[in-house]
Each structure stands twice: as C-alpha cells, then as structure tokens.
Amino acid sequence: MKKKLLVLTMSTLFATQIMNSNHAKASVTESVDKKFVVPESGINKIIPTYNEFKKAPKVNVGNLADNKNFVASEDKLNKIVDSSAASKIVDKNFAVPESKLGNIVPEYKEINNRVNVATNNPASQQVDKHFVAKGPEVNRFITQNKVNHHFITTQTHYKKVITSYKSTHVHKHVNHAKDSINKHFIVKPSESPRYTHPSQSLIIKHHFAVPGYHAHKFVTPGHASIKINHFCVVPQINSFKVIPPYGHNSHRMHVPSFQNNTTATHQNAKVNKAYDYKYFYSYKVVKGVKKYFSFSQSNGYKIGKPSLNIKNVNYQYAVPSYSPTHYVPEFKGSLPAPRV
C-alpha cells in the first residue's frame, strides 16, 4: 500500500512539474511585447512581436532590409524562454544579438531620425539598411569599412560593442558614469562591467562609445587607425586614446565620405597616415593650440615626441590624457591642412 501511495505521489508531482513548466513557458512567452532580443547566432533568427505573431509574414534574410526599426532593451532579456523557438518572422521592431542570452544590443531611442543609406552588401549582411555584424563577421565589417551612417558591431561578448551614429557635431561633454552616456548609446551602471569598469569606458564626443580594454578588438594597435564613418579609435595598452569625429566633408582633411560609399579605406595608406595616432599619448601641444585643450593639472604639460605634429590636425583634436574626463571642445579657428 505504501509503495502504491509513493508511486501515486511521485506521479502526481511529476505531472504537476510538467504543468507548471509548460505554464511558465507559456506565460513568459506571452509577456514578450514589441521590443525583444533573440538568443540566436544566426542573423536571420528573429522573434516577432507576440501580438502580431500570427499575422506577421514569414520572410527570409533577404527581406530584412524592409524593416524600419531595430530595438532591444535590457528588461526584455528574461522574457525569452526558448531560443530554439526563435522565429524568422519579422515585424517593425526587432533585435539581433549574440548567441548568448546575456548579450544584448543597446536600445536605440531615436528610431524616427534614422536615414536610409545605399549599400551593395549581400542581403545576409544587411538589416534595416543599417548593419549588424556578429562573431566572425565583425572583422570583415570593420576592415572593409562597410559601415554606413548607422551600425552595431558585436563580438562574442556583449562588452565588445561599438556604436556609431550620423552627427559629427560636438554638443556637450558627456558624463559616462550616468545612466545615459548619450542619447543614442545607453549604458546603465549595472551594465557597465559588460564594457569595462565605468572609469575605463571611453567616450568619443557625443555619439560613439568604445570599451577601453577591448578597443584593440576593433583597431589593431601599432597600425594606422581604421576609419569608421568619420569616427576613429586608437587603442594603447593601459592608456587608451580617442580621436573625435572629424567633421563634414568640406573640412580640409582628405577623408572620404562613407554616406554612400563602402570602399575599403582601411587599406588606403595615404588616408590612414593622416589619422595615425599610434603614439598619441606623447603628443606635444604646440603654441597657439594649447588653450583649446582641456587637461587635468597633472597632464597639462606632458611633452613628448609627436608622431604627427598636432597642429596639422585640422578643426577638431584628440587629447593626450589618461582619463575620459579630459576632453577637447570643438575648435572654432582655422589651422593648416594636415599633411596627407
């Protein structure tokens, strides 16, 4: 009798667990709303809005360019239950993150300000007329400069993320320790370790965030810096440096426009030479330019042999500092054109 009772009890518990498990999956799945992430490695594995699941058309990866927005937020992560159930159905809001559930693309707030850009990239590399590159694709996207006005590039881990946007104007210096680094790229304090320690996170003007310890994943140290849509990053071991966005095409630096151009300028030594800040930390602040820089007292008079005379950098400048708190305001004057 005891054995029968034990068997009956175990059977009941097992059935209850199955029911609870199924119920949990169903309830969590139903909680997925119009902003979500997909823990899938394939670029075409996308979850639709739950409410529009049945009426959303099934599309292949070649149709992804028809989508208009691309949004993901941290609080939606835990609402995805079964990664194998990720669907190819796409609606107007979607995200393509990395293969691990904890890897999420930052939420882009100004979806209405996006611009459509021309591209000759294969459909498999194209999402929303902007770009998402993951895993092994990352090196191809960056080295070939096939990154137009908007792009998100992710490596195997979430903290290796780089984001660039259209504007090249300096609006204000941004405090990266706050919840919002800038209006495009959000890093909450709880998320900051995914990039680096907050004090290590580098801010490039108003639109471009690069995690310090992982900057070398995007630009090879010891080589001419890679141009990414008028934004440039130069890493240095233990002292990462940044170069601000250069400006508009009308400025004197001979940097090509990437608005509708996917040329592999990384291989253009002549262009790269103008942006070679390999020994950036050792720049000498030349006479007549120093007053436009913002230095801490300890770094205010660092003198060294420059690899490229800083007076040859037109319009906007980088700063030889060891902290993101040292930044440069936009220079309003006129300088000689750089030697290219």
Swiss-Prot record:
Record keywords: Signal
Residues of the signal peptide: 1-26
Cellular localization per UniProt: Cell surface
Superkingdom of the source species: Bacteria
GO cellular component, one term: cell surface
Chain's role: Adhesin that binds to the host cell extracellular matrix proteins fibronectin, fibrinogen, collagen, and vitronectin.
Protein name: Extracellular matrix protein-binding protein emp
Chain's gene name: emp
